Amino acid sequence: MKEFLIGLLVVFLSFILVLIFNALKAKLTARKLTKRNEHKTKEEQIEYAKRLSEMIKCETVSKEGSYDDTEFKKLRNVMENLFPNIHKSAEKMTFSDDCWIYKIKGKDESRNIILMSHHDVVAVTGEWLHPGFCGEIFDDSLWGRGTVDTKTPLFAEFQALEDLLSEGFVPECNVYIGSSHNEEIGGDGIPEALKYFKENNITFETVLDEGGAIISPPLAGIKANCAMMAIHEKGRYTLNCYAKDTSGHKGLTANKNTPVARMSAFITEVNTKNLFIKRLYPEVKGMFTHLCPYAPFIMTLLFSNLWCFGSLLKTLMPKLNAQAGAMVGTTCTFNDINTNKEEKYCHAKAFLRPVYESDLKEDLKQIEKIAKKYNIELVPAENNECFKTTDVNSKSVEYTKKCINEIFPDVIPAPYILPAGTDARHLCSISESVIRFAPIEMNDKQFASVHSENEHISLDSIANSVVFYKHYLKNYR
């Protein structure tokens, strides 16, 4: 018995030592964070902001089912005036109503990269401290719809290339800039451009779009901001759900099994049951691996030993918040619920966001079981899609991290899964490396202003974005 207890103690101590060893090993991988140099003077920051403000003043709101070119034409004129070198040197193509594709030829014309940021915005609603399209500077920030999402990255891409061209720069490979006019409504801009790329056998070594940024740390206890790079985007899958009634006139029966009642029960059960597969996907593990060396020791211990604590984490993450839950499995939202006057049928749409297509197939089986229970017919909508992920260790991801470290030495780069949507998803079929990261730095208020009131961005963030893209293009090999 004594030998057994001693053996048990040895096993337990060995287990603890392994946990501590892995945590210490992770701590040793932490890069020393250093103070950032001011890349631009205050006067230069203000000058960039004034130029960007001309773009912000263009009210390029995209709307479902209609297109008015007035404000979009105004923006095109602004771009031509602001960036004459690009418009003189680049080949420009337009797809759909106003999706721009610019191409600057490189030394090696067989290779291509593309920088992206859409130029449409959502409508200004709610109460703002300053007019929604004022494009004016207050408290060292530029205010207006699009300053964060995403005219600042678009401006920075153009300004960086404009500056480089004025210096006689010739890129190592072809450099494209893509900007759609209807990203916010899931429009046809980039999909139309994709047809052209495929017809001409154009592929991209790297796609760099919006979707990530420099934000407050997502893990408690980390004292530096984090450059979150989305290397995967959740898929989109819509199910039309139908409940029908064959019982005759509802007023002549006491039937409680109505289409509305059955649909309500179906939706309730799908929403309340833990139906879907939960996993710690490689992209999420990569996020923890990159962030945990900078966290307090107990957090490092947890995240550096996912072999031990992974099951616990994938159970806890959905309980932390919706965004954390979205990274470990499929989410399902019901909308467009309607019935006819006689309540002879009820229709609802189930909008699913899977991480991987393989998991979606299993998740759909769970929904189908519940649908059968309530006699609900399920019909998949058209244009359902899942997207290819980017290898966290790919050359493009490593290069992007390198540029972040060099321009923002006080920031921690990390990959993650994007639960929202970008234009970049359309190019997954013609690129092995699709990265969703814009080098804008936001505090919590600025992050919360996306698609909300009081959207604004700091002047130094605008300038640093230009510096980042210039560095990225100049050193791309």
Model-flagged regions — what are they?
Residues 1-10:
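Feature marks short, highly hydrophobic, charge-poor N-terminal signal-anchor/signal peptide-like helices
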Residues 12-147, 167-171:
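Acidic/His- and Gly-rich active-site-bordering loop/insert found
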Residues 92-93, 108, 215-216, 276-344, ...:
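An extended, acidic, His-containing surface patch that forms the Zn2+-binding/catalytic region
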Residues 119-120, 270-275, 368-376:
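A common structural junction motif
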Residues 142, 148-228:
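Acidic/histidine-rich catalytic neighborhood of metal-dependent amide-processing enzymes
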Residues 152-163, 262-265, 464-468:
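Short amphipathic alpha-helical face segments that pack within enzyme cores
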Residues 191, 199-361:
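Midchain, well-structured core segments that form catalytic/ion-binding scaffolds
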